[in-house]
């Protein structure tokens, strides 16, 4: 539950900051503060923070700080693209190296045949590269308001759909001692 809150909390803070706080600058500040609080809570409570959370928060701190200092919203808008590309490369390379990173993230929930982990790695890499392209299209061609709404009402449903589309692979290739 804490992990979910730490992922969704900064997005909610960003959305609220944009629509109720006065635009991208406020939204960025709210998101930065919320992200630091969430990652700190995760560390204090769980005594660990995932590598992906560290990467995500680091990119956010850099792009968010540049946005606040420069007043240019482009930096916060390219943050998702940068993260999606980094994550896409991580999942692609782990699949190529036959050491699927996604296995370590999900193995406590589901146990799969090794080749299924590799397939899931490639699919996840493709998803992240797709999302990088979509983010670029949206922020470059639409208003700030549309981009913010897309981050909340577009990215989350697209991610849920991607996860649901992976269920047949997971169910077909799960090992007998799997939790799902």
UniProtKB/Swiss-Prot annotation:
Q: Where are the transmembrane segments?
A: 4-24, 25-45, 52-72, 76-96, 118-138, 150-170
Q: Which GO terms describe its cellular component?
A: plasma membrane
Q: In what way does this protein cross or attach to the membrane?
A: Multi-pass membrane protein
Pfam families attached here?
IspA
Record flagged with keyword Disulfide bond: no
| Alphabetical UniProt keywords | Cell inner membrane, Cell membrane, Membrane, Transmembrane, Transmembrane helix
| Location(s), subcellular | Cell inner membrane
Q: What is its main location?
A: membrane
Purpose of the protein: Plays a role in cell envelope biogenesis, maintenance of cell envelope integrity and membrane homeostasis.
Q: Which PANTHER family match?
A: INNER MEMBRANE-SPANNING PROTEIN YCIB (PTHR36917:SF1), INTRACELLULAR SEPTATION PROTEIN A-RELATED (PTHR36917)
Q: Which family does it belong to?
A: Belongs to the YciB family.
Cite the NCBIfam families for this sequence: ispZ, PRK00259.1-1
Q: What is this protein called?
A: Inner membrane-spanning protein YciB
Organism annotation: Rickettsia massiliae (strain Mtu5)
